[in-house]
Amino acid sequence: MTNRLIYILLAAIAAILPASAAVRTSLGAPDLDAIRTASTDEASPYYYPTLLEKFSHNDTVMTDVEFQYFYYGALFQEDYDPYREQTDAATHMQLLPLFNKKEWSRAERRQIQAHAERCLLDIPTNLRQLTNLIYVYEQNGKVDLARIWQYKLNHLLLVIASSGNGLTPETAWVVVYPQDEYDFLNLSGITAKDQQFTPPSCDYIIVNRKTESSPEGYYFNIAELIRQYYIKHPSEADDAQLPDDAPQEQPQSTDPQQ
């Protein structure tokens, strides 16, 4: 799937992948303790349900900080599960061949939009489904809606980009869902080849290098992701014999979402 929106997205996050440093933004790495407190406090302006409602509106009023608290605040919600099953798996499989097409028919666009909206009800920050939704809006001639949701997607990508530079475990990008690793790289024009778990709490994504000087791969910090998974699945944590503060084994992942 190629279109001018993808190039706009690439331009928006082009600074994230040089070997020199992380993207220049005012956000920086997330303070997960502060986000945990604020996202579960009904009196906070960063209370997760408040930000979720704000995110769902067809406007561009959210700030960089609100996007950061919204993205990472999902980690601390009762229904959060990073390895949850694919939303509407049957439809997902049915639609897969369509994503090799450059243009979709009106009927195909309706199917893709409906599936994207169902997935976004489950995971509002699903980067891939946000991209699909934007593309449907553009093909349907709904330029204003495409721009609004492009704005939201760009800011979610910048939240991840600002969390590190991906070059070492210590400066790994911080993600909320495993699929975000692949979608983040793909939307940056980088193709993943393989994945390795790097103890205690990083995924290392091996990529197709663009040049000889390009990194062979990028690190993603999934420490809080794993911690929250084992909070929800304590029997698996017991089996893994993990210390309280350092997950050392990645749970079995389900198939990535389209």
Feature annotation, model-predicted:
Residues M1-G28:
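Bacterial Sec-dependent N-terminal signal peptides
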Residues E108, H115-A116, W149:
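Alpha-helical solenoid repeat scaffolds, predominantly canonical TPR units
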